[in-house]
């Protein structure tokens, strides 16, 4: 089954380019596009994509606000932030809002396609440098509930960049069980995304910075 993608950007030339690059991969299906955050939230509800590629700077409603709304209302939909310049404030805002990762708009087409597939698989992909930066900037969850041993093992694998399928195979369970467990983990930690859960794992020593997703 193909990965369903919603494109969000207020520049038509960017949308056209993304359509061209992504359309070359038979595993990817573009189901819609939006020009601002408000439209993105509406289309996310209507289309239920697997992944939203979200521009951060847009009129009406910015991408960070839209990301937060989508992640709270549709937690099964992953969001990858798109940015033209790597600005700490914007990237951190996107991660806080629940984005699983981010990409620069000049990212090579192959890397873009890989990142979308990784996001659809629930795979956190951040460089050690970015993880280190986010550890200093993204707030630690307030009074998180304690995780059980099994949940800690799932979180450890998630923080190491394993996909849902890889975690399922490592633990000899079904993929839907992994998704349910991760949902429980996010709820207990009080965080909106796998990325913030992975940061929590590094902070608490469950994994080292070197072990964290790359």
Where are these regions (language model features)?
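Recognition helix of helix-turn-helix DNA-binding domains
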Residues: 161-196
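Acidic catalytic/metal-coordinating carboxylates
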Residues: 36-39, 61-65
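Basic, Lys/Arg-enriched C-terminal extension of HTH/homeodomain DNA-binding domains
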Residues: 187-214
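Active-site residues of response regulator receiver
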Residues: 9, 55, 83
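Active-site beta3 strand of CheY-like receiver
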Residues: 47-53
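Receiver (REC) domain active-site loop signature in two-component systems and cognate sites
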Residues: 58
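Short, flexible helix-to-coil linker/hinge segments that flank and couple to helix-turn-helix
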Residues: 89-96, 100-153, 206-209
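Short amphipathic alpha-helix used as the core "switch/output" element in two-component signaling
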Residues: 42, 64-76
